[in-house]
Amino acid sequence: MEAETGSSVETGKKANRGTRIALVVFVGGTLVLGTILFLVSQGLLSLQAKQEYCLKPECIEAAAAILSKVNLSVDPCDNFFRFACDGWISNNPIPEDMPSYGVYPWLRHNVDLKLKELLEKSISRRRDTEAIQKAKILYSSCMNEKAIEKADAKPLLHILRHSPFRWPVLESNIGPEGVWSERKFSLLQTLATFRGQYSNSVFIRLYVSPDDKASNEHILKLDQATLSLAVREDYLDNSTEAKSYRDALYKFMVDTAVLLGANSSRAEHDMKSVLRLEIKIAEIMIPHENRTSEAMYNKMNISELSAMIPQFDWLGYIKKVIDTRLYPHLKDISPSENVVVRVPQYFKDLFRILGSERKKTIANYLVWRMVYSRIPNLSRRFQYRWLEFSRVIQGTTTLLPQWDKCVNFIESALPYVVGKMFVDVYFQEDKKEMMEELVEGVRWAFIDMLEKENEWMDAGTKRKAKEKARAVLAKVGYPEFIMNDTHVNEDLKAIKFSEADYFGNVLQTRKYLAQSDFFWLRKAVPKTEWFTNPTTVNAFYSASTNQIRFPAGELQKPFFWGTEYPRSLSYGAIGVIVGHEFTHGFDNNGRKYDKNGNLDPWWSTESEEKFKEKTKCMINQYSNYYWKKAGLNVKGKRTLGENIADNGGLREAFRAYRKWINDRRQGLEEPLLPGITFTNNQLFFLSYAHVRCNSYRPEAAREQVQIGAHSPPQFRVNGAISNFEEFQKAFNCPPNSTMNRGMDSCRLW
C-alpha cells in the first residue's frame, strides 16, 4: 500500500528538519553569545570575576530566552510582572482569533501543532491502532470543509424535524414534520434526550463522581447547568458592557433562527421571551461564593428528592438519561438510589419558574441551547455569524483556523487516543525522575515549614496536616491505561466514523461522552489511577483522591527545563506549579478533605478559626488590586484558594530549591547564565513570572475577573512575591517599595 511505503521518506524529512533545527540553534546561539561578549566588551554587561558561568548551548539558549522576555528599564521592586514580562508581551501580541494570549496559550498552540502533524499522517493499517485510525478519520472529516459547506444546515435541520428537537420558532418553515406541538411537548423527555444523547446539560447537570464523604464510592450528582453567556452577572447587571452582551446574545439567537428558516418577526418575538427566561434562571443560580463543599453536599435518595421537589419525575429523568443497553447493571435504579443534590434551592426555584412559564418559551429555550452547541459544526455562514457575536463578547476579529478548531475537537472527543499519539513521540520518560525530585522537594519544604514556622496551628491538627502531606500522590505524564491498545480499542468499538459525514461523527462523539461517566456508577473509585488528558497544558489537584497531576503537555519549556539547564529555572516554573497544586490540599476548600479524600472535619476549632482569620489578609490584599483593562477590582474572596496556592507554592518551591543546592551541590551555587547578571535566586523568581506572562483584551479581562478562579496574571505574580521576604532579599527591594509589603505581608503556609 502507498501509505506503507512512505516511512523512509518521512524519516528523511525528519532528518532534514533535525539538521535545520540544529543549524538554527547553532547560529542563534552564536549570535546570542556574540551579542553577550560585545555587551561585556562595551561595559554594558558584566561577568562577575569570582562566579562560575555556564556557556553550554542550553545555558546560552536560556539566557537568550530570558533576555527576550524582560524589560530592564522597569524597576523589579516597583512592578516585577512588567520587569519580567514586558518583553514577551511586546513581542507576542494577541492573535486576532483569541481573546487573550500568554505563555500558557503559546505552549497550548505548540502542542496543537504537534497534534496536527500526527493527525495528518496517512493512516497505516499496520502501524496505527483501530483507535488511532478513528481519530485520523474524525480529523479528516472535520477538515473536509467542502463537504461541510455542501451539507450546510441540512444535518441540523434533520434533527429539528423530529421530536423532542422541534423548534417552535421555526413554525412550519422547514416542513410540516418540523412543526412543534404543545400537546406533545415533554420537558422530561427533552431534557433527558439532550443529556443522554448529546451531552447537553440544560437547567440540570447530572453526572457521576466520587462521594465527597465516602470517596471510595461513586455517586450520582445533580447541579445547576450553565447559561448561554459565560458570566452569570451579565444577565443581572445594568452596566454598559452587560447590556451590550445581552443585546448581542439576543441578536445572535434571532439571526441563527432566521438562518435556519424562521420568519424574522417571529424570531424577534420568540427570542425576547427566551432571553427573559434565561435571565430568570440566572437570578436563581447559586453564586460562586455560596458554593462551599459543605453547602453543596446534600445526600438523599431519589424518593426523598421527589418528596422535596415533586414537580419533576427525577427517577424517570435519570432512567431515561442512562442508556441501559450500555450499562445493563443500571436497569435497577430505583427510588432508593442515593444522589447528592448540590443546589436544592436552585431546583425548587427552577421548577417554580418553569411551572408558570409558557411551554413554547421553554421549548424554544431548550432547543436554542442545543442549536447553540452545534453551531461550530455547521457551514461558514453560521461561523461568520458567530464571529459577529464573538466580536462583542470576546473581542476576537477572525475565526480560528480550521485545523486548530479540528485539533481541539479531536482532543476533547478522544482525549486518550490523541494523548497516546502525543506521548509516544514527544514525552521523555526521564522527565518522571526529575518530577519526582521536585515533588519530594516540595513535600519536604511544606512539612519543614509546618514544623518550624507555623505558629498558629495546634499540635493535633498539625500532625494530621503532615499525615495528609505525606499521603499526597503525584501522577506524572499520562495514565498507564492509555498505553493498552486493546482497552482503548474496545472502549471505542461502537463508534464508526465517516470522512464524508463530519456532523454525524460529532453526534457519535457526543453520545459517547454523554454516557461515559455512567460507567463508574456502582464501581469503586480507583484511588491510584487518574483520568487527565495527557496533552493538557495545565496541572491539577484532586481532593477526592489527594492527588497532584502533571500531564505531559505541561512538562515542556518554559515550564519544565531538563537536567541540562539550571535547576533554578525548573524550580521557579514547574516547581512552583508543583507547590501550587500541593498547597491546594490545604487551601480554603482542599483543607476540608482528609488524607483519604473524604469531606471530614479534621481541624480543631481553634486552628480552623485562626486559618479563617489569616485568610482575611489575603482576601483584602487581592481585593484591593484594580485592573484598569477590566475596569474592575479583583475578587479576593472568589480567588482565595488559588491565591493561597500561589503564595504557598512559591515558598515551598524556593525552599526546595535551596535544599537542592545544599544537598546536591554542597551549598555551591549553580553556574550563572552568561551576560544577564541575574543570580540563581533571581532566575528562580523570573522563571516563576515567565510562565504567567499574559495579555488580555478588555472583554477577556472582564470575564477573567468575573468568573476566573485565578487572580489576573500580573496580580498572581506581584501578589505572591510582594509577600515573600526571599524575593525582596534577591532583588534588594527597600521596605517602602511596592514589591515589599513588609509587615502587611500575608501568609498561611
Swiss-Prot record:
Positions on the Extracellular side per record topology: 42-641
Membrane topology qualifier: Single-pass type II membrane protein
Ranges in the topological domain labelled Cytoplasmic: 1-20
Positions annotated as active site in the UniProt record: E581, D646 (proton donor)
Tissues expressing the protein: Specifically expressed in ovary. Expressed at low levels in kidney.
Swiss-Prot/TrEMBL keywords: Biomineralization, Cell membrane, Disease variant, Disulfide bond, Glycoprotein, Hydrolase, Membrane, Metal-binding, Metalloprotease, Protease, Signal-anchor, Transmembrane, Transmembrane helix, Zinc
GO function terms (MF aspect): metalloendopeptidase activity; zinc ion binding
Complexes and interactors: Interacts with MEPE; the interaction is zinc-dependent (via ASARM motif).
Name recorded for this polypeptide: Phosphate-regulating neutral endopeptidase PHEX
